[in-house]
């Protein structure tokens, strides 16, 4: 594992890069939740599953966390810094999959089109503030539009006890609801790894199986 610093318009990011045992086949860039670090059980389960399939993996500590802040700041600034990080990591030309947990999942969805991601892995996607589900006549409380606007294939993994809500099946290419899990997604990392490995196998240029035709349509 190699840790590098990448300078962005929001300050330095720290990135832990790992390589697969064999020839690299694709790149997976992952990040943390709003006040967290990228070494949570769910993020590490994704990293390990991806690396077993031949991915170069990059776990990103975003600039605001490197500074010691727990608040991400504006979405525009966060997204701009993320795009700069991914650009610095993507010079190999490998197919890109990006993702994160909670706030990091939102960043991955919002920037997927811009960075040309082949797929997004959204862990514990925070559909709405706790206890405030989005309903007709109450705009702005549901964040499902971020999933739908990703412009690429999206895998969502949420716990069935997540107070931030659970996306609907048609909000993404695949929505996996894990029984007994809360927003932390910490109880069954093996199930997360299995779901991620299965889904990665459907991505063109990465897997050997045809992509799923259910849920969100892939980009043309």
Predicted feature residues:
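Gly/Ala-rich beta-loop-alpha elbow adjacent to hydrolase catalytic centers
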Residues: 100-108
